[in-house]
Amino acid sequence: MAGRSAVSASSKWLDGFRKWYYNAAGFNKLGLMRDDTLHETEDVKEAIRRLPEDLYNDRMLRIKRALDLTMRHQILPKDQWTKYEEDKFYLEPYLKEVIRERKEREEWAKK
């Protein structure tokens, strides 16, 4: 039983650290999500290209708003910040698919 409580305590501590780091990064204060801040490699660019139109438009709106806020040296009101619990990794499934396809092409090229 002691092992489970230690795991639970470390899990809570780790989750608390994740939330702290999420807020410390600052992108949420501009209304951005984690996937909006990814470095745009070729794989990420292809994943963005494959996004459904509504997700792509939402992403562009968040990025444009963040740029505007940054230019004016402002942040959103606290009630409009992206919350850790609400941030979803919307790009991840598309990115995994792109990476899988690229690795498959590389394997075929080796043969």
Curated annotation (Swiss-Prot):
PANTHER family: CYTOCHROME B-C1 COMPLEX SUBUNIT 7, UBIQUINOL-CYTOCHROME C REDUCTASE COMPLEX 14 KD PROTEIN. Its main location: mitochondrion. GO terms for biological process: cellular respiration; mitochondrial electron transport, ubiquinol to cytochrome c. The modification N-acetylalanine is found at A2. Pfam families: UCR_14kD (PF02271). This is Cytochrome b-c1 complex subunit 7. The modification N6-acetyllysine is found at K12, K19, K78, K83, K88, K96. Belongs to the UQCRB/QCR7 family. The keyword S-adenosyl-L-methionine does not apply. Component of the ubiquinol-cytochrome c oxidoreductase, a multisubunit transmembrane complex that is part of the mitochondrial electron transport chain which drives oxidative phosphorylation. GO terms for cellular component: mitochondrial inner membrane; mitochondrion; respiratory chain complex III. The lineage of its organism: Eukaryota, Metazoa, Chordata, Craniata, Vertebrata. Component of the ubiquinol-cytochrome c oxidoreductase (cytochrome b-c1 complex, complex III, CIII), a multisubunit enzyme composed of 11 subunits. The complex is composed of 3 respiratory subunits cytochrome b, cytochrome c1 and Rieske protein UQCRFS1, 2 core protein subunits UQCRC1/QCR1 and UQCRC2/QCR2, and 6 low-molecular weight protein subunits UQCRH/QCR6, UQCRB/QCR7, UQCRQ/QCR8, UQCR10/QCR9, UQCR11/QCR10 and subunit 9, the cleavage product of Rieske protein UQCRFS1.
